[in-house]
Amino acid sequence: TLQGQKDVIELLKEEGLRDKIKVMVGGAPATQAWADKIGADCYAENASEAVAKAKELLA
């Protein structure tokens, strides 16, 4: 869920892990604007795009 995505980022911040873990969000209700709002590192519209963006994040 969108709230779950936001919660994960908040928990990572609380545990001091946010700068060590990349977060990609997606799914039907998610958008780039949502990813920006919650502080995600990346947004992908679909699985194929997620693979390409994951490779970019890890490069």
Swiss-Prot record:
<dbReference type="GO" id="GO:0046872">
    <property type="term" value="F:metal ion binding"/>
</dbReference>
<dbReference type="InterPro" id="IPR036724">
    <property type="entry name" value="Cobalamin-bd_sf"/>
</dbReference>
<feature type="domain" description="B12-binding">
    <location>
        <begin position="1"/>
        <end position="59"/>
    </location>
</feature>
<comment type="function">
    <text>Acts as a methyl group carrier between MtbB and MtbA.</text>
</comment>
<keyword id="KW-0170">Cobalt</keyword>
<keyword id="KW-0484">Methanogenesis</keyword>
<comment type="similarity">
    <text>Belongs to the methylamine corrinoid protein family.</text>
</comment>
<dbReference type="InterPro" id="IPR006158">
    <property type="entry name" value="Cobalamin-bd"/>
</dbReference>
<dbReference type="GO" id="GO:0031419">
    <property type="term" value="F:cobalamin binding"/>
</dbReference>
<dbReference type="GO" id="GO:0015948">
    <property type="term" value="P:methanogenesis"/>
</dbReference>
<comment type="pathway">
    <text>One-carbon metabolism; methanogenesis from dimethylamine.</text>
</comment>
<protein>
    <recommendedName>
        <fullName>Dimethylamine corrinoid protein</fullName>
    </recommendedName>
</protein>
